[in-house]
Regions:
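Structural signal for interior beta-strand "rungs" in well-ordered beta-sheet cores
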Residues: 2-75, 79-82
Length: 83
């Protein structure tokens, strides 16, 4: 199961894995895949067609425009991996 907070929007054909956590105001566009154990923080946006890898963390307010590798952390606009 996944945990979605208040104000989350999940688009058409989105696939959400097990144990995913989404903070308030997260927007997941259509045709997105979120891997198991991912965490997406407040106000983040994941654009259409993106895959968020298993165990990844998306920082608050990030705009994810490309795939996120498993077990990585991305932040910013556009979202980039932390070094």
């Amino acid at each position: 199961s996944a945990q979605l907070n208040i104000g989350c929007v999940v688009g058409h054909d989105a696939r959400i894995g097990d144990y995913v956590t989404m903070a308030q105001g997260v927007n997941i566009a259509g045709n997105v895949t979120i891997g198991n154990d991912a965490t997406i923080f407040t106000g983040a946006i994941v654009l259409p067609g993106v895959t968020v890898g298993e165990g990844s963390i998306i920082g608050a307010g990030a705009v994810v425009v490309e795939d996120v590798a498993p077990h990585s952390t991305v932040v910013g606009v556009p979202a980039k991996p932390l070094a």
